[in-house]
């Protein structure tokens, strides 16, 4: 893995502290697209929602970027916000725009590397080069590279052109959604990375315990409700979904998160299939990119870069979640 230092690409970097714990850097670009261009919760104003103005840079392998693809699909914004998909291999040059094997290349500028998008926005940028990136074609800059904020923009800022009937962050449920996110993000979404990229036994076991305690908590919650916040699909579900989808094919083996599979949890496994079968979601899933990225890119974890053939997965199989009543 690498990063930019004063606008120059450095290909050697590893994100662990003195105790061997994986440390995720905060996202640096935190502006918001709003319906009228007024400033959002953070950053500057001037980013008005307009069809055709914004572009997403994503990886089909990345769970954080996958969130944005799901919201783009469900909110019917495919003709409003364009997209470029990076290659699944993350090597010495970071994310690349090699246009093969399901990757699109850089459909805006024809660049070779994602880090060139970052330096196009800020020639002296220092920090990691991550996906997703929400790009403003008009101002030629990065609006935001924090997935949790991008999905909230997609949820409401473009309702004039998308499906305004869907609201995954409704006002009356926000407190509970935020509370669920505060459990799921550190323990599960980031927890698998904390286990997988740990460089000490102590750090690995700490992350491992926290991860499976949180999964047990969510499993119990889903025994009482169809979704994480009652009987209504919300942002909290989609934030968890992208991690659950990758758990059995990647995190169990590659990140050593092997106490139990999602398939071993009755409620979580049925819930995962339920979400996968929401119209529009399956089209955002690329298991080939997911598996080849993790197993092929992380040489420190998998030096031979052999990609497992299994497991057999059928996310389209029937589920039992319809036993819960629907939200009024």
Regions found by a protein language model. Give the residues of each.
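C-terminal alpha-helical interaction module
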Residues: 1-328
């Amino acid at each position: 893995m690498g990063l930019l230092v004063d606008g120059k690409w450095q290909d050697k970097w590893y994100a662990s502290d003195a105790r061997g714990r994986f440390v995720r850097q905060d996202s640096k670009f935190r502006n918001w697209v709003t319906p009228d261009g007024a400033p959002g919760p953070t950053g500057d104003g001037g980013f008005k929602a307009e069809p055709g103005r914004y572009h997403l840079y994503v990886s089909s392998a990345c769970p954080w970027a996958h969130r944005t693809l799901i919201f783009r699909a469900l909110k019917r914004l495919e003709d409003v916000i364009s997209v470029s998909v990076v290659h699944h291999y993350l090597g010495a040059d970071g994310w690349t725009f090699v246009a093969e094997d399901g990757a699109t290349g850089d459909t805006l500028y024809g660049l070779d590397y994602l880090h060139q998008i970052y330096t196009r926005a800020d020639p002296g940028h220092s920090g990691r080069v991550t996906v997703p990136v929400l790009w403003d074609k008009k101002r030629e800059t990065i609006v935001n590279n924090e997935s949790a904020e991008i999905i909230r923009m997609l949820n409401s800022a473009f309702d004039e052109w998308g499906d305004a009937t869907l609201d995954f962050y409704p006002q009356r449920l926000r407190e509970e959604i935020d509370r669920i996110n505060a459990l799921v993000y550190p323990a599960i979404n980031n927890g698998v990375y904390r286990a997988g990229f740990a460089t000490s036994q102590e750090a690995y076991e700490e992350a491992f315990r926290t991860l499976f305690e949180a999964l047990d908590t969510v499993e119990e919650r889903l025994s009482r409700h169809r979704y994480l916040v009652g009987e209504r699909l919300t942002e909290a579900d989609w934030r968890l979904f992208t991690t659950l989808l990758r758990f059995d094919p990647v995190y169990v083996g590659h990140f050593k998160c092997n106490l139990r599979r999602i398939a071993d949890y009755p409620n979580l496994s049925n819930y995962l299939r339920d979400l996968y079968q929401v119209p529009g979601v399956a089209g955002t899933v690329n298991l080939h990119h997911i598996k080849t990225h993790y197993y092929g890119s992380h040489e420190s974890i998998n030096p031979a870069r052999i990609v497992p053939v299994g497991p057999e997965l059928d996310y389209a199989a029937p589920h039992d979640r319809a036993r819960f009543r629907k939200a009024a």
